[in-house]
């Protein structure tokens, strides 16, 4: 079966799991958990470029075929015509998509206010206080106190998942790849799901599928306990609605002042460089 590949990236705690649960209602679409496809492609490419064995007798056409086959082999067990691969680094790797997968990438990017993302992480850590989250483990290893301010600073540090995702997402703008990216605002998705999904299908150039936003099911669960120390990191409620608190109810003035108004994608008209 010939398969079309689309991509999900964007920011954490911005509804990507919810969004994939909606897309999975379409019988033609497969949206699995986070994928290692890009990493496998990257490290295979690095091997061919640096390995003594590969350099001693280079076969560039065969190297290209091997890397190009990664995504087909990874999804060989999926019998659906449209595959949605999730990796937060796709916007920073449009060139690899074009070189090895398709010349016309379509990357779906759920996004959200940065302070809402931080507030969501803090609430989740508090809900799972009987576990040691990946955030608290990093702080303990570095000798920092387990305060909410420190948690937010870690998430926004170069080692933190929020900053890393912002960087990869921002590189899509820096490389003039906006035309390959469709942004899905979290608050639009939960407040106006049908209108938001119609825009998604229009971007994908697929016929619209009528979704049931009151009967959602998360099919592909990640090992959140083992990997993140947060048992409900990728939970999806059956009925679509917004239940999170406002950031002002969760975060300190220090965090609110430091990380407000970072949503560059709402005002970017040209390549940007936030990460100098």
Residue ranges and their predicted role:
Residues 36-43, 189, 265-276:
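C-terminal/domain-terminus segments
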Residues 33, 86, 253:
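Pocket-edge structural micro-motifs
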Residues 1-70, 77-78, 220-226, 230-233:
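PAPS-dependent sulfotransferase catalytic core
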Residues 7, 18, 106, 185, ...:
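Amphipathic alpha-helical recognition patches that constitute DNA-binding helices
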Residues 34-38, 110-115, 212-217:
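A short, structured active-site edge motif that brings together acidic residues
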Residues 81, 85-211, 226-235:
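PAPS-dependent sulfotransferase catalytic domain
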Residues 1-6, 154-158, 166, 173-175, ...:
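PAPS-dependent sulfotransferases, especially Golgi type II membrane carbohydrate sulfotransferases
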Residues 58-65, 136-143, 237-242:
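Short, basic, helix/turn surface patches
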């Amino acid at each position: 079966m010939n398969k079309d590949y689309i991509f999900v990236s964007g920011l954490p705690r911005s509804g990507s799991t919810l969004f994939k649960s909606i897309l999975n209602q379409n019988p033609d679409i497969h949206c699995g958990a986070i994928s290692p496809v890009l990493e496998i492609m990257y490290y295979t490419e690095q091997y061919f470029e640096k390995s003594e064995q590969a350099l001693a007798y280079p076969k560039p056409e065969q190297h290209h075929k091997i890397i190009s086959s990664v995504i087909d082999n990874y999804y060989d067990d999926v019998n659906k015509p449209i595959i949605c691969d999730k990796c937060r680094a796709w916007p920073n790797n449009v060139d690899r998509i074009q070189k090895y997968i398709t010349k016309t990438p379509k990357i779906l990017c759920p996004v959200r206010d940065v302070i809402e993302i931080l507030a969501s992480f803090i609430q989740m850590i508090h809900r799972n206080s009987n576990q040691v989250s990946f955030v608290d483990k990093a702080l303990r290893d570095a000798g920092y106190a387990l305060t909410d301010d420190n948690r937010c600073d870690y998430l926004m540090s170069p080692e933190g998942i929020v900053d890393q995702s912002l960087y990869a997402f921002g590189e899509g703008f820096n490389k003039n790849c906006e035309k390959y990216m469709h942004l899905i605002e979290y608050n639009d998705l939960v407040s106006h799901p049908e209108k938001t999904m119609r825009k998604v299908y229009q971007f994908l150039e697929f016929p619209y599928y009528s979704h049931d936003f009151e009967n959602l099911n998360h099919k592909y669960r990640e090992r959140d306990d083992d990997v993140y120390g947060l048992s409900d990191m990728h939970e999806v409620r059956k009925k679509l609605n917004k239940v999170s608190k406002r950031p002002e109810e969760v975060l300190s003035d220090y965090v609110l002042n430091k990380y407000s108004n970072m949503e560059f994608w709402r005002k970017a008209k040209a390549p940007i460089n936030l990460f100098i």
